[in-house]
Amino acid sequence: MGQSKKLNKQPNSLSPLVQLAGIRKCFDGKEVIPQLDLTINNGEFLTLLGPSGCGKTTVLRLIAGLETVDSGRIMLDNEDITHVPAENRYVNTVFQSYALFPHMTVFENVAFGLRMQKTPAAEITPRVMEALRMVQLETFAQRKPHQLSGGQQQRVAIARAVVNKPRLLLLDESLSALDYKLRKQMQNELKALQRKLGITFVFVTHDQEEALTMSDRIVVMRDGRIEQDGTPREIYEEPKNLFVAGFIGEINMFNATVIERLDEQRVRANVEGRECNIYVNFAVEPGQKLHVLLRPEDLRVEEINDDNHAEGLIGYVRERNYKGMTLESVVELENGKMVMVSEFFNEDDPDFDHSLDQKMAINWVESWEVVLADEEHK
């Protein structure tokens, strides 16, 4: 989350495929998308991420042509498609329910779109079989949907969506109906398929782990607005505000007060009663309130016994949760704040398996913290 962990950013040479400009949408007089601008690049896997009701599915439906905008423009490959019917947009959508035809075979489900487009009969079989090979279902062509597993149905829906070679594939929470293990498997398969096809994917989800795993770029939304737009690493390690920080994974938020600025990067501050140096990349004044954000895995803990003294935030272990590779501890600071700490499991460390009520000192590597201004005390 800090300077010492940043990777070099790769230059973005992708060209725009979809451009949303000044998009506004209301339902029953209620504004759900007040003013949205978004560019989606050729060949990228972009995820719209946010809580229920944030507007992400509405944006997807506007791109697909399943809803009409109240104002603004939608461009696809430099062509204005704002008022173009959905069937003429060269955009396909995979819904959460998959929407397979139960009376048709897998082959006929995949071929349906080609027949609707009046594709020459001689082309249909090779194109359908090519699509089924891409999703490793060529031997299932004559089965009915009820004879397939959930993951196989998912792949049929994707094959049907890509068989007519759309410019853009939209996926609306299309993994959420799968069990955990199958969902993890499909995340990898979907990303590999996207790379193989070279088609631009726009994926909608409220699952943060899913977004971090699959995406080239994540757009975090709240109340119809974009809160942050960046790579998974940027979103996780450099959240721009408290909403993004709290929505993406676990995070600890410490209250801090500025004492003085030391140099261009560092500020001396009181953090939950402890004086320390923090990295602040914006102007601050003595006495100003700040938030210091640290992920559980970025914290370091040390047991304190009666005969030793340790620097750091002092607290006591209140809960321990064994997670296989990690041990998660909840530490209560002396001021009552609860802090989550995650440590990689090390059975050779005699002090690793902390006892309940064990006194602890919490520290972190300087510059790994993210510091945000306190909006309420500006």
Curated annotation (Swiss-Prot):
UniProt cross-references to CDD domains, sorted A to Z: ABC_PotA_N
GO cellular component: ATP-binding cassette (ABC) transporter complex
Membrane-related topology note: Peripheral membrane protein
Classification via Pfam families: ABC_tran, TOBE_2
Task of the protein: Part of the ABC transporter complex PotABCD involved in spermidine/putrescine import. Responsible for energy coupling to the transport system.
Catalytic activity, as annotated: ATP + H2O + polyamine-[polyamine-binding protein]Side 1 = ADP + phosphate + polyamineSide 2 + [polyamine-binding protein]Side 1
Domain of life according to the entry: Bacteria
Chain's gene name: potA
Name of the protein: Spermidine/putrescine import ATP-binding protein PotA
Family recorded in the similarity comment: Belongs to the ABC transporter superfamily. Spermidine/putrescine importer (TC 3.A.1.11.1) family.
UniProt-listed SMART domains: AAA
Top class in the EC scheme: translocase
Cell location: Cell inner membrane
Keyword terms of this UniProt record: ATP-binding, Cell inner membrane, Cell membrane, Membrane, Nucleotide-binding, Translocase, Transport
Domain (ABC transporter) ranges: 18-248
Subunit: The complex is composed of two ATP-binding proteins (PotA), two transmembrane proteins (PotB and PotC) and a solute-binding protein (PotD).
Binding site for ATP: 50-57
Lineage, highest ranks first: Bacteria, Pseudomonadati, Pseudomonadota, Gammaproteobacteria, Enterobacterales
